[in-house]
From Swiss-Prot:
Motif Nuclear export signal in this chain: 392-399
Taxonomic path: Eukaryota, Viridiplantae, Streptophyta, Embryophyta, Tracheophyta
Domain comment, as recorded: The hydrophobic-rich region (HR-A/B) corresponds to the oligomerization domain. AHA motif is a transcriptional activator element.
Chain intervals with Basic and acidic residues compositional bias: 266-279
Chain residue ranges for the region called Disordered: 266-287
Designated name of the protein: Heat stress transcription factor A-6b
Keyword flag Cytoplasm: yes
Amino acid sequence: MDPSFRFIKEEFPAGFSDSPSPPSSSSYLYSSSMAEAAINDPTTLSYPQPLEGLHESGPPPFLTKTYDLVEDSRTNHVVSWSKSNNSFIVWDPQAFSVTLLPRFFKHNNFSSFVRQLNTYGFRKVNPDRWEFANEGFLRGQKHLLKNIRRRKTSNNSNQMQQPQSSEQQSLDNFCIEVGRYGLDGEMDSLRRDKQVLMMELVRLRQQQQSTKMYLTLIEEKLKKTESKQKQMMSFLARAMQNPDFIQQLVEQKEKRKEIEEAISKKRQRPIDQGKRNVEDYGDESGYGNDVAASSSALIGMSQEYTYGNMSEFEMSELDKLAMHIQGLGDNSSAREEVLNVEKGNDEEEVEDQQQGYHKENNEIYGEGFWEDLLNEGQNFDFEGDQENVDVLIQQLGYLGSSSHTN
């Protein structure tokens, strides 16, 4: 006899009629026929069955909270389902960490959330954004969350690991480590940024070198300009201290002007000689008066054309004085060339004038004179010389105006 089966007490048999009075104790009978049937055939009895999934554990709270977080349409600007509804995307990790994680979890660390996804087998779909997917994490199919299992990790190296099936191994091979994959992408991005920064640094260094060289050239030019300015101021100060300097320049200028006038007169003599020849030829031939008159008119026109407008091309007295100061030694050689051009009966007289002019220039304005004049004024103080410079300018202006009036 099976001890699990017991007699069932029949409290309300079929023949018992309802009555307002409670039944007596003798009315409770045991059905012997039912007991015998249960003993003979136990399958005829119906056992109470548990509800489906009663002994199964539900999905982990992490997956449930994550699903509710993604399903909420009010936070689609931060996290939402993808277009294919088989993955979810975190659009704003900063806002996700600050606002949503503390609401559903006990932390606000986005990296911890990603590591937790990794332990449940989520994979990162797109390396350029935070998009995660799992075969059991689908939109509108929350009941599939129970199929997602947490990976078992053992810290004890001596613990025996259970062998996995070929299917599970293939799934693990295709599964991407989410946290590590994200770190690799960030490292690649940092390497690219480093390379770009290195190229920019090299370009800036080259630009700095070129700018430094340019500034060095500018400084050298500025120093040369300042030295020339100091020499000019020293020269002007020295000229103001030497009252005979201006007088010597004026006398030298007058002598040069006399020599130029003498040279211009001597150049006109061949033209005058030709005129006399025409007149003589006219006297001998008998009809030369008309020819002489016409030739004299032509000669006068040519002289007027040649020498009449020389004043337009003459330099001002101040310009000549400046040129004379800058290159007085070169003027003597130029004068020699001009004087050597003159040929004729007066060649000896011109050479004597040239030698006297050259001798006077060497005596008065030799190389030693200019060198001493510049060297003596190198350390001169220019603070109180503004009045002397103004006087020099007035004297130079007086010389220019007097030359034009003459």
